[in-house]
């Protein structure tokens, strides 16, 4: 955070010296977007464009910030404007592909990714994105061929997954051994390794978090911290003023609303109070597991940042199985949950699985039916989901990740 604040000061000084410095405004936008303050970033990108209407980079960056906020149509217009100014802007073509993939328009996405590669044959992201689209379409041989074209962590994750699904256990074990030599804390691979080791009854050699279900912590904070119903009312009142989106395309939320900005980038008293509570509980959590040899605990990052979001689920609302690959530790604080539900309705379910792997009902899982003021902490490599519920009441929660810097 210190370096980013210094960068902000430098760019502001540049503008103080030269008020029409479009590049400085664009760079300020980049810093605020990195700080997950996309609304602020948008203002700076727009100022850069106002000064220099031919600033293709600012249009591309503005598109990214708008996409962060779920403004897909506006983002598309910005990327198209960037390309109009600079027809060889491979990044804008790649970003157009990302938008159309989110909108589930795979054919359009393919065309834009291919164009990005045509302009820049070394565009790693575009190759990975092409692989992901073909994977979405079930064209696995094509997906593999694109993942093989790069040496990125993402492509290695996908090829490791395919080795188990298509080539069998022995090939997977060889590839995992090679992966461990270079990367020991990849959350996607940790999820995969935990699943395969249990399913195949073999030793889990991936050191990040070998048995993640053992690291789920559930604590009700109402009595521990004398939280009151007034606290939750004030918190909900504040959260209702934050812009949220129905079933955002980039999330697993179905039948509900979710915010896309980082809630913890705020000066709001109630939200900051909750953040401080969570920080203290994480210290306690680490103390509980301090003797673990798993790298999840042993190699806990020295510098982290929070990312938090609010989820409001309605009747039949749920979240599909997912994990938080960018996080280290993840969690949920339940503000207010529906009452009188049937067994497991509205519960959070933890399971040993990985993206693209089918759930194996013979493998262990953990289901928790939350109460108001419950705090649940767990490794970010652990797949989880919310089970649908039938109540007319709303289910209010704040989810968060602790992310290594």
Predicted regions and their residues:
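Canonical positions in the second alpha-helix
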Residues: 14, 48, 82, 116, ...
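Residue-level recognition of tetratricopeptide repeat
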Residues: 21, 55, 89, 123, ...
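Conserved alpha-helical positions within TPR/SEL1-like repeat arrays
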Residues: 23-34, 57-68, 91-102, 125-136, ...
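Non-heme Fe(II)/2-oxoglutarate
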Residues: 205-297
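Catalytic core of non-heme Fe(II) oxygenases with the double-stranded beta-helix
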Residues: 269-272, 276-279, 283-377, 385-405
